[in-house]
Amino acid sequence: MSKRLKILLTNDDGISAKGMSLLVSNLLKADFADLYVVAPSTEQSGKSMSFSYTQPVSIESVDYPQEVAGAWAVSGSPVDCVKLALGDLFYDSFPDLVLSGINHGSNAGRNIFYSGTAGAAMEAILSGVPSIAFSQEQHISFFQTDSAPELLRKLSFYALSNPFPVVTGFNVNFPASERNEPWKGMRLVATGKEFACGLPKLLSSDGKRKSFSLSDCQVVMDEDISEECRCLLDNYITVVPLLVRNSPLALTSESEFQQLQETFQEFMCSEADTRLFDV
């Protein structure tokens, strides 16, 4: 019998978020790992890789409504959660994998650079732990649970298979089907440039002072639509590799990427139930 994995779960929507509950419940159904939740006590969306540099941050053991091995709430950002988990809670025995999400809303395209969900995954990678960030387009209610346990299991073991000679992770986005159609499958793609968030919306102005909201999102597309965006529009789950080399996000060469796409398909087809996934 293979050993059970030790997985750290975090997010940026907060420890009580529906997306975290969905991630936990589907991992429990897959039953291949012991789960530890270390997540912000309040919503921390848009925090990217920020951490509490100028003020103290606290961590508190909490009761979680699902059967996890342990749960802690952190008074800080998603990166704070990963730093405290790896630097304190699991200092002597790192988790095998860090899973972040499931985010309420897309983190495809440009959103990845602002995302606290992706920021937590990147922090784990920088610390030497493979990681995956999960996000659901539009609204968390679009998340489909029928095939999710097997999908999460396969992606977890793929991240642990060392597809690159460096510690790696993935940014996974689930499409939103207005007609609730089943996901068509998975596609490993490069990061697109669509889906910009943070557009200024004027709330009030008194002549001297203006007040804005930066929570508006607008899909920005060129005529040359990215493969990531096209796949999501076609109801495919997108899997984008995150690599740490000399910069926070480093893309491979075209030939390396094509090779990665081939190995991704081979790995997923090696055990995957083709009735569930078209990879």
From Swiss-Prot:
It holds the Pfam family SurE. It is found in: Cytoplasm. Its main location: cytoplasm. Its cofactor is a divalent metal cation. Keywords: Cytoplasm, Hydrolase, Metal-binding, Nucleotide-binding. Its EC number is 3.1.3.5. GO terms for molecular function: 3'-nucleotidase activity; 5'-nucleotidase activity; exopolyphosphatase activity; metal ion binding; nucleotide binding. GO terms for cellular component: cytoplasm. Nucleotidase that shows phosphatase activity on nucleoside 5'-monophosphates. Belongs to the SurE nucleotidase family. NCBIfam families: PRK00346.2-3, surE. HAMAP family: SurE (MF_00060). This is 5'-nucleotidase SurE 1.
